[in-house]
Amino acid sequence: MTGAKTNQVDQRPLSITDLLHFIPYDLQQTFLFEAILSYGKIYNLYPIKWVFLIALALFEIGSLICGAAPSSVGLIMGRVVAGIGSGGLFAGAILLVAEFKPLNERAFYNGMLGAMYSVASVAGPLMGGAFTERVTWRLCFYINLPLGVVTAVIVFLLVPNNYDSGRDSRRGLPLKKKLQEMDLYGLVVLVPTIICILLATQWGGTKYSWGNARIIALFVVGFVLFVAFVVIEIWQGDRAIVPPSLVKRRTVWACSIFSFCLFGSFLVVAYFLPLWFQAIKGDTATESGIHNLPSILGTTIFSVAAGGMVFGLGYYTWACILGSVLAAVGAGLLSTLEVDSNAAKWIGYQVLYGAGCGFGLNQPLIAIQAALPDFQKSEGTAVVIFMQTFGGTIAIAVAQNVFNNKLVSNILAAGIPVDPAALLSVGATKLQGLVQPQFFGRLQLAYNDSITQTFYVAVATAGLSMAGSILIPWLSVKQAVAPEDAETANTVMPFQHPSSDVDLAMPAILRQSGEIASEDSQSSDIEKVPRNNEVSTYDSQTSEVEKSSVGSTNRKVESIRN
């Protein structure tokens, strides 16, 4: 359970600042971002099973260090180790499913994975708050140990050792060549880039004004470093940690935009809605978790339901679009919450918002599986998860700025005799003790307005996610091929039946018969025969398939199959 962050090694209850800093800039977060992209390469170079188990071991070691930390330095180091390990866990789980299940069945299983991920994102911090208040903050980390052991035993016993040994030819490279494949130059430049961006978004408007020289300098340096990172990636080519050939794909960048925005919206609601229950309804951390169940259940149920519907219909783009719409509407309704809002409102709004996130959050990972060939799936998965995580971090930082600034201005405008800094440093459940009884009603109104303002950030990011969702190609997960350029070779109109196996195999058939020029005369045409004797056609966007008669085609199909 990494959601609960403890800024000081003590037994005090979580303050508002603590809660807002569950996903802030710190050393662990930077290493987490680095690790996510690194694992995209590592999973291509080494067997998925063993990489996953090593990542899990690092996460467990980091959790143990955090739980036993005698000082803040030890806690930070433990978080770094845990972050390096956790960066490979979700991507590894997705890739393990991809290895054992055909494309059309992955939607359902990935839906269940996404549901558990969403539940953990919401429930983890709330459980951490309860542990901190009632037991000890160390339990936030110790609880990971038995759960990790059970996971490791299951993976070790049930996943074969050499099931994916032929997945990527680069696995046979010597260690020196594998290190060159890791794009160390890009990784080194990416670290300060992330630090500058996160510091600027976290400090701007709170610790320093947006026009402060420090904030401007951070943005300028971050931009320059980002440009340098892009240049390095272009120079590295396919060795890059984010290969340019991958970024050029419409599915990858559209899914990245969608994931960045929708997950950012999801985390804003996940972390500020419990504050509303604690400050406005007087809940404890545990009670706010119970009142947050409609959101958790909505996300979980509709994530699994969306996976089943994608499995049945064959398409996932519709779920992304619907998810964006429902999430934006749900977040908008949450922004209307008042001090006296009844249970029917906050339950209904949560269910609607949870449905939107459930429908949409997991679909980009299905899109990556459908649109990319095997050798790019791990890198594509890592890029989408990176953008998802980074989007959540940026959205939380922006929402925190909105909350802090609005609360201070509301306190001053209402003439409430309380120090805003002191208000931000105590727990949301301790508000009543800060002011005299006659001022508490005004304080609640100020607090309610400040929290609901953060939901506008969730509305905006959910709305922006629609730009990505409508650009995701309509591909079918029911087709038996995974072309390298599926976005053009295998795109059909929504809800049409997929092409027959003869139609899908046409490019390979014609090439083998000599009716289409060889690879040397075409623009990046690649052919690959995947597992289970499936015919896979890889067509570039510029190549065109020549027509042939049905009778001739059928004879060639039979000849090839025999």
UniProtKB/Swiss-Prot annotation:
Residues 515-562 are annotated as: Disordered. PROSITE patterns: MFS, SUGAR_TRANSPORT_2. Induction: Expression is up-regulated during the late stage of P.nodorum wheat leaf infection and is controlled by the cluster specific transporter elcR. Keywords: Cell membrane, Glycoprotein, Membrane, Transmembrane, Transmembrane helix, Transport. MFS-type efflux pump; part of the gene cluster that mediates the biosynthesis of elsinochrome C, a perelyenequinone phytotoxin structurally similar to cercosporin. GO terms for cellular component: plasma membrane. GO terms for molecular function: transmembrane transporter activity. The keyword Transmembrane helix applies. It is a multi-pass membrane protein. GO terms for biological process: transmembrane transport. It comes from the Eukaryota. InterPro entries: MFS, MFS_dom, MFS_trans_sf, Sugar_transporter_CS. Residues 533-554 have a biased composition (Polar residues). Belongs to the major facilitator superfamily. TCR/Tet family. Glycans are attached at N448. This is MFS-type efflux pump elcC. It is found in: Cell membrane. Pfam families: MFS_1. The lineage of its organism: Eukaryota, Fungi, Dikarya, Ascomycota, Pezizomycotina. It comes from Phaeosphaeria nodorum (strain SN15 / ATCC MYA-4574 / FGSC 10173).
